[in-house]
């Protein structure tokens, strides 16, 4: 399957190299602030693997032995890991070139890539479409640097992390493809933790083929990662996906989606959703209907509470993970002028953490610490866990494929016919916001609501692929900023989701 794909990708990369030199890539990086470190190899690598010649950027919260890993935080500004993360090792052993580290929100906490010691990432879309202008917009976050590097053609693909939408939101804003895999399919060993039960390593690229090729090489069982899905669980999920793809293969070969059941979750159209996004999404749905897909409205009632549950759970886990950065065990220590302060451990902690953590990280530590206190534990943390389980149950209820992680009876043919193969929804409530709007926002809640459409799949641990919406059918002289549409599948159906994404991508380009 991947032999022809690998050759095609390699030839397209070589062609692009001739028109996009390292100097142009460096210039694009200066314009976007996408990568915080950038180094191209002195000579082309030998063809030694399926990712040979592929230039890949790595988000700055994934450790690399030859680049600093700062997590965009002062507390780790001088840290260089002695080893590579598992995903980085697999990229290298398959021939990929790691060219640098991508800017991100501090420790992955943010939706607009503005909480960073390296400065905000600028969306490269206007650079490629209308030339450099003053309409500077966010690239999204927290994997904004990864998305911008791909969109600006600085690299062919990038690794990012997605906790509540940090790959899909930037992919939508920058007009590229972004995959958040099923939780546990890609190793987290060597990823600096934000929220362990939610963090996923994923892929951003310009097209679904490249995304799929990179994902294929990094999605293997890793005994070093206690959350890595076991081989037998992966095999069961792959078998179900392959079976469903085989059932649809005849139609797909003829350019049709006949037999594919796509659910439209009714709760994913909040009041904050812009009319422009809604209209573009409707055009995507119409395109799928014209290709023979069956569009089915579905309800996921508990997802209405997902944003609140997510920020309680993620912040609680963050408060625990951030406790290690105290200036004694880990992280930069802020010097003290008074020697007596060194006798007070709490003083060293407080001085280091208040000086090196940014405002958003401090805010989430406070929120998470409060949620874990005795007075708030039942009403906040445990209640959020209950909501999370209800959200998982909602998704399992509408999917035709069973969730192989749980012991449950398979759907009968009659039951399966009333359910859906994938879900489709807008990736974001709007197109990329202007950076000056972000900087003058009255409340951090304005940024939190950007994740309202992406956190349900994160809480359920499901695969979600954001791809660009087809161009608008209306004629206008104004530049249309990118808008993404997300395809969500049952746990472990990542290859099926990618196949549907590939078809929609191809149909949109006709």
UniProtKB/Swiss-Prot annotation:
Cysteines paired by S-S bonds: none
One Gene Ontology term, aspect cellular component: mitochondrion
InterPro entries associated with the record: Amidase, Amidase_CS, Amidase_dom, AS_sf, GatA
Reaction(s) this enzyme catalyzes, per UniProt: L-glutamyl-tRNA(Gln) + L-glutamine + ATP + H2O = L-glutaminyl-tRNA(Gln) + L-glutamate + ADP + phosphate + H(+)
UniProt-annotated catalytic positions: 59, 142, 166
Superkingdom field: Eukaryota
Cellular location(s): Mitochondrion
Pfam families linked to this entry: Amidase
GO molecular function annotations of the record: ATP binding; glutaminyl-tRNA synthase (glutamine-hydrolyzing) activity
EC number of the protein: 6.3.5.7
Keywords from the UniProt entry: ATP-binding, Ligase, Mitochondrion, Nucleotide-binding, Protein biosynthesis
Biological process terms in GO annotation: glutaminyl-tRNAGln biosynthesis via transamidation; mitochondrial translation
Gene3D superfamilies reported in the protein's UniProt record: Amidase signature (AS) domain
NCBIfam families associated with the record: gatA
Assembly: Subunit of the heterotrimeric GatCAB amidotransferase (AdT) complex, composed of A, B and C subunits.
Family statement: Belongs to the amidase family. GatA subfamily.
Cited function: Allows the formation of correctly charged Gln-tRNA(Gln) through the transamidation of misacylated Glu-tRNA(Gln) in the mitochondria. The reaction takes place in the presence of glutamine and ATP through an activated gamma-phospho-Glu-tRNA(Gln).
Record protein name field: Glutamyl-tRNA(Gln) amidotransferase subunit A, mitochondrial
